[in-house]
C-alpha cells in the first residue's frame, strides 16, 4: 500500500455520499434489493452448476439466505436443493481442479515444473487471474487446444503415477478399476467403447479416462 495514493474524499454509492469504511460499504451494497439474488446466484454457479438456477430454485435459496444474509444457510440450501441433488455433470472442472485431482488419485510425486507448465498452457496459473473477476467458468475450459494439453499432461502423469491397482486386475476389469481409482462411479456406453481398445495399455487407459466427460465434469 502507498499512502499518498489513497483517496480520502467522500464517495457516492447508490445515492449515498460519505467516507465509507469497509463495513459501511458492504452494508450499503447488501441493502440493495437485488443483492440477495445476485449473491445466491453466484454461489449456486460456484457449487451447483455453470448455468444459473431456475427461478424456483433461486427463490428457495434466497429465502434460506434471508434478511440476515446467512451464508451457512445459503450453502446448505444449495447443497440440499432438489435441482442440485438431481443434477449430474453440470459443472466443468477448472484446470486446477482437474490437475490436482489427477495428481492425488495417481499419487504422482511432486513435479513443480510440469504442473506450472501445464497450468500456464491451460490458462489458469494460481494467483494470476486474467482480471479482478477471476477466471471464467464452464465450456471455455473444454476447447480443442486445452484438450491436447490435458492429454499430454495426463500421459506424463500416468507414467509417473501409481497404477498398480489397474495393472494388478484382469484386463476386462480395468475400466471399472480406473473408475474406482479416479472417483468415477459409472461410465457411459460411449465412454466404455472408447476406453476398451486401451485395456492392455494402463498408462494410456488412465490418461484417456481422466479426459472423459465423466471426469471433466461434476
Pin down the residues of each PLM region.
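Non-catalytic, conformational "gating/processing" segments within enzyme and secreted inhibitor domains
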Residues: 1-52
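Flexible, low-complexity segments enriched for small/polar residues
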Residues: 40-67, 75-218
Amino acid at each position: 500500500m502507498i499512502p499518498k495514493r489513497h483517496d480520502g474524499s467522500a464517495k457516492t454509492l447508490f445515492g449515498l455520499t460519505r467516507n465509507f469504511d469497509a463495513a459501511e460499504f458492504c452494508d450499503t451494497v447488501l441493502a440493495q434489493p437485488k443483492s440477495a439474488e445476485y449473491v445466491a446466484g453466484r454461489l449456486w454457479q460456484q457449487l451447483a452448476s455453470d448455468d444459473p438456477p431456475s427461478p424456483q430454485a433461486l427463490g428457495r435459496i434466497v429465502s434460506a439466505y434471508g434478511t440476515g444474509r446467512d451464508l451457512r444457510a445459503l450453502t446448505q440450501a444449495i447443497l440440499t436443493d432438489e435441482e442440485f441433488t438431481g443434477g449430474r455433470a453440470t459443472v466443468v472442472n477448472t484446470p486446477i481442479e482437474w490437475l490436482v485431482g489427477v495428481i492425488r488419485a495417481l499419487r504422482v510425486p511432486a513435479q513443480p515444473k510440469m504442473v506450472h507448465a501445464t497450468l500456464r498452457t491451460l490458462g489458469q496459473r494460481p494467483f494470476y487471474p486474467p482480471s479482478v473477476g477471476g477466471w471464467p467458468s464452464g465450456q471455455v475450459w473444454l476447447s480443442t487446444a486445452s484438450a491436447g494439453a490435458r492429454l499430454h499432461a495426463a500421459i506424463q502423469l500416468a507414467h509417473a503415477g501409481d497404477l498398480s491397482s489397474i495393472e494388478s486386475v484382469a484386463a476386462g476389469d480395468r475400466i471399472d478399476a480406473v473408475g474406482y481409482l479416479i472417483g468415477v462411479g459409472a461410465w457411459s456406453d460411449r465412454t466404455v467403447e472408447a476406453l476398451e481398445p486401451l485395456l492392455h495399455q494402463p498408462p494410456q487407459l488412465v490418461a484417456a479416462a481422466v479426459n472423459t466427460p465423466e471426469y471433466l465434469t461434476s
